[in-house]
Amino acid sequence: MSLKIPKILVTGNGGLLSPYLIAAADIMGDVVATGRKSGDIECDLLNENEVKVLLRDLNPDWVVHAAGMTDVDGCENNPVKANESNYLTAKNIAQNLHNNAKLAFISTDQVYPDNIGPHKEKNVGPINVYGRTKYAGEQVILQHPGAIAIRTNLFGTSLTARRESFDDFVISNLRMKKEITLFTDVFFSPIHMKTLSKMVFDLLEGNYTGVINLGSRHGMSKAKFGMEVAKHVGVSTEPVTFGISDMIVGRAQRTHDLRLDVTLAEQGLGYIMQTLQ
């Protein structure tokens, strides 16, 4: 008897991560991508009736909810929109998805406080609107019996028009010999989007539930990461200057040390997370 091929719904089509998620989902099952104005099926996730119809008609086995507002400063300047994008969409999905389905929510490392990392999953304390609305989204998602909330930070080449990753920013500016400032006081544990996407589906297939950090082992400063990216692609770092994040006036507050403790991930996945070097 053949195993059932899962029907997979990926939200957030048109986002930075979506092409990688869709490619990984396509290996695992039959995938449908949705966005507000793009994707296989258009759906306004803020409209609960549209979400109900989508989930009823598609009847997915697995859902990866990757849609949301990720601009930290944009969220701070428009908290209502941030709440709608990061909490209300999650609520509409979680409360209308049948209980036998599995649900993964792409959250953020910005839920952690401005303390020294690496952060364990229980160490929550967001200091900006983005982190608070994503954490609210986690809370409602986790009311679904088969849910995972994935806290992460991404890198990798953007495959989405008009969307740029941090390493894209570094490479494109240095290739044009434009000066960039890399922060020495910000630390993180980014993971490549292709690797992350595979892990999302490994966790769903393995019936993992709860909150989990997915990131690189150990992590590093954004300054060091930017220099490593430049070295990897062979561009000159002459235009690089170094600074601290607090030198920029008017930005939303951000946690300085976003390094992730990936012990639970290694236990849940059964393998050691990669380092950045």
Regions found by a protein language model. Name each.
Residues 197-199, 206-251:
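Mid/C-terminal beta-alpha module of Rossmann-like enzyme folds, strongest
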Residues 221-227, 243-277:
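Conserved C-terminal active-site "lid" loop/helix of NAD(P)H-dependent oxidoreductases
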